[in-house]
Each structure stands twice: as C-alpha cells, then as structure tokens.
Design a protein with these regions (language model features):
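Accessory RNA-recognition modules of RNA-modification enzymes
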Residues: 1-201
Length: 201
C-alpha cells in the first residue's frame, strides 16, 4: 500500500494491515508476525514471492541481501515518490497541528540515479561466523554480518576498486577485523570520500 519512514511497508492481509520493514508497494511477500501491539501487527520479511510491477530499476548482485539501499529496484522517479510521501507524512503529523498554513514544496532529486555517493563508510567483518574477511555493508537486518559489495551501484568504479584492493590486502596479510564480543582484532571501518568537482579521494 505504502512505505512509512523508516522503510516500514504497510502490507494488506485481507481487511487487516501489518507493518513489514523493507517491503515495497506492489510486492507480494511472506512474513512472520513478531508482535501485535494495540491491534497493530508488526512482521519480519521472510521472502518476496512476487516482485512489484514498479521494480524495473538496475540493482547490484547483492540487492536484498545487502542493507545499503532499499529502493534501488525502483526507477529513480518512483524512489523519489516513495521518499517524498514519507517526508510529507512526517511533516503532516507535526505541522497540521499548528495554526499557520504551510505548503510542502516536494524534494529535489539528484541529477544522478546511480553512482551518486561522494562519501561511504564500509565496515570490516565476516559474512558468516568465522568466515573470511569481508569489507562492505551490513547484511539487511543484521548488526554483525557484512557483505563485500564489489559491484555496488550507488558508488563509482573508484570506490569499488578501493574496496576490493583494501579487502584483498588485509586478507592477504591476515589482519583481523575487530570482534565486538571478544574485543580482539583491529579493523573496523573504511571511510572513503571523493570530491565531485576535482575527483580527489
């Protein structure tokens, strides 16, 4: 039906609705109900059984597994609509209570639908417990597991090259990532910035 901030899809089940994070308008999904509070159900997305007709955007090979982006499967115009509706609902809930009239002017889109990030913070970790070194983004819904996003669509080729080179180097010299539970290891984050005008990294 719609997506509320932050990424909370409102899913119809017969005459009822449930909040299922990371679901998109038009998708058919399987989910498990985690809790029901004040008559409102909240669920965890298990599987997208049928993609939305809106999902015609270009995605990377890890889309859905990686938690780095949610709306990339939608064309950029649809992404903007979803985000604009979210912002307007948030503002409505506050500004409609005041006496003065206000006008929502919309949001301004980026000139680039892909490779638009000029700063990224990648995390070191492993893709599964005791797995090989990974450098990239957190898996969707996970605080610990990391996926190496070698073909990420929201950064350009320079970022992808740096990501792969740094990961390969530290894997080769066997420097471990920092383990939150045991407080062992060293590597935590890789922050990369690129000046859009000069290309300086």
């Amino acid at each position: 039906v719609r997506v509320d901030f932050p990424n909370k899809g409102i899913v119809c089940v017969g005459d009822e609705t449930a909040v299922v994070k990371n679901s998109l308008p038009g998708q058919k999904v399987k989910f498990s109900v985690n809790k029901v509070r004040k008559g409102k159900a909240e669920g965890r997305l298990l599987e997208v059984t049928e993609k939305s007709p809106l999902e015609t955007g270009r995605t990377c090979s890890l889309f859905g597994l990686c938690g780095g982006c949610t709306y990339l499967s939608l064309p950029y115009e649809e992404q903007l609509k979803v985000k604009e509706e979210q912002v307007k609902r948030l503002l409505d809930s506050v500004l409609n209570k005041q006496e003065e009239a206000w006008a929502f002017e919309g949001i301004k889109g980026s000139p680039k639908a892909y490779e638009y990030r000029n700063k990224m913070e990648f995390s070191f970790g492993d893709e599964y417990k005791d797995g090989p070194l990974a450098l990239g983004m957190h898996k969707r819904g996970s605080f610990y597991d990391i996926v190496t996003v070698a073909d990420c669509e929201i950064v350009d080729a320079d970022y992808r090259l740096i990501l792969q080179t740094v990961r390969d180097y530290f894997a080769r010299v066997k420097v471990s990532f920092f383990h939150r539970m045991s407080h062992e290891g060293y590597l935590r984050h890789l922050l990369v910035r690129k000046a859009s005008r000069t290309g300086e990294i």
